[in-house]
């Protein structure tokens, strides 16, 4: 009854903002900016930055809105997501779909007209990968959903790079590899904390299918791997000592959280690990940017 009543209420503009998952998109756009500046020997045109961020941001918002739409039944079961606009009934399925299509087309148009076709194509593939392949299939099909689907979420720095150069580059793929390796421990920590909700929603996250302790072990192993991968920019002379120091400090700190999580039964530690993983990625890319210019 509550959902039916909510559906009759006027839609607030903030509901549409929420559909775009702004906090997730902002973190993603940070990696886009870093990708752009790392690709440039000097400074990047503010005009190019503006159109790139706006275009990719709109497409990311479109993918997020489709995620809200497809996952509305799952979201209504989970405490963390039950009050999302579509799940709660504040935004109808039709409204969410039209919103996603419109801003997605706007974003792609901006990229084609003012950035370059390669970036537009890669952004479109990323949108389909996240909204279609991951949300529409992988999330419900396999416990490795975020490992496979994480490739779409790891693409933003590559998009920023191609926006500047108009071509693919091995160094840009290294940035993708960092985020790709970061994704499993990030999401699995949340999945441990929200274990019961994922179980009730019948989503085959790793803690649900293989147990919490097995998931903790995988978080530990992936965090070790992430520490190694994060040092590769220095190894290939893509970055210098400032980045190396930052990557080591952040990586060791992340490993401390993974170690603590492995040896405790307190759910709050899983959430603390999840939150630190966000800070880790943000600061790691800031170190990349600072190191590039200093």
Curated annotation (Swiss-Prot):
State if rRNA-binding is listed as a keyword: no
What are the entry keywords? Cell inner membrane, Cell membrane, Heme biosynthesis, Membrane, Transferase, Transmembrane, Transmembrane helix
Q: Which residues form each disulfide bond in the chain?
A: none
**An individual GO BP term:** heme O biosynthetic process
Give GO MF terms, alphabetically: protoheme IX farnesyltransferase activity
The function of this protein is: Converts heme B (protoheme IX) to heme O by substitution of the vinyl group on carbon 2 of heme B porphyrin ring with a hydroxyethyl farnesyl side group.
Membership in a protein family: Belongs to the UbiA prenyltransferase family. Protoheme IX farnesyltransferase subfamily.
Q: What else is known?
A: Carbon 2 of the heme B porphyrin ring is defined according to the Fischer nomenclature.
This chain belongs to the protein called Protoheme IX farnesyltransferase
Native organism is Legionella pneumophila (strain Paris)
The gene is cyoE
């Amino acid at each position: 009854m509550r959902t039916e009543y909510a559906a009759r209420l006027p839609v607030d503009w903030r509901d549409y903002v929420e559909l775009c998952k702004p906090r997730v998109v902002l973190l993603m756009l940070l990696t886009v900016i870093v990708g752009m500046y790392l690709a440039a020997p000097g400074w990047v045109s503010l005009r190019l930055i503006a159109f790139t961020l706006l275009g990719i941001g709109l497409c990311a918002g479109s993918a997020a809105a489709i995620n809200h739409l497809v996952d509305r039944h799952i979201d209504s079961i989970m405490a963390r997501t039950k009050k999302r606009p579509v799940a709660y009934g504040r935004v109808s399925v039709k409204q969410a779909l039209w919103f996603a299509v419109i801003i997605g087309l706007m974003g792609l148009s901006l990229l084609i007209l003012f950035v370059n076709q390669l970036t537009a194509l890669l952004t479109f593939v990323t949108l389909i990968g996240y909204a279609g392949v991951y949300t529409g299939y992988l999330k419900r099909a396999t416990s490795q959903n975020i490992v496979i689907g994480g490739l779409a979420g790891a693409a933003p720095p590559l998009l920023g790079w191609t926006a500047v150069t108009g071509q693919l580059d091995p160094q840009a793929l290294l940035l993708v590899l960092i985020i790709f390796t970061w994704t499993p421990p990030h999401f699995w920590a949340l999945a441990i904390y929200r274990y019961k909700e994922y179980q009730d929603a019948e989503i085959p996250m790793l803690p649900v299918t293989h147990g919490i302790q097995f998931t903790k072990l995988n978080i530990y192993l992936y965090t070790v791997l992430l520490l190694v991968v994060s040092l590769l920019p220095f190894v290939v002379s893509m970055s210098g000592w400032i980045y190396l120091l930052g990557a080591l400090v952040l990586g060791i700190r992340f490993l401390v959280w993974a170690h603590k999580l492995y040896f405790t039964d307190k759910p709050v530690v899983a959430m603390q690990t999840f939150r630190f993983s966000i800070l880790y990625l943000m600061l790691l890319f800031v170190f990349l940017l600072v190191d590039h210019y200093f």
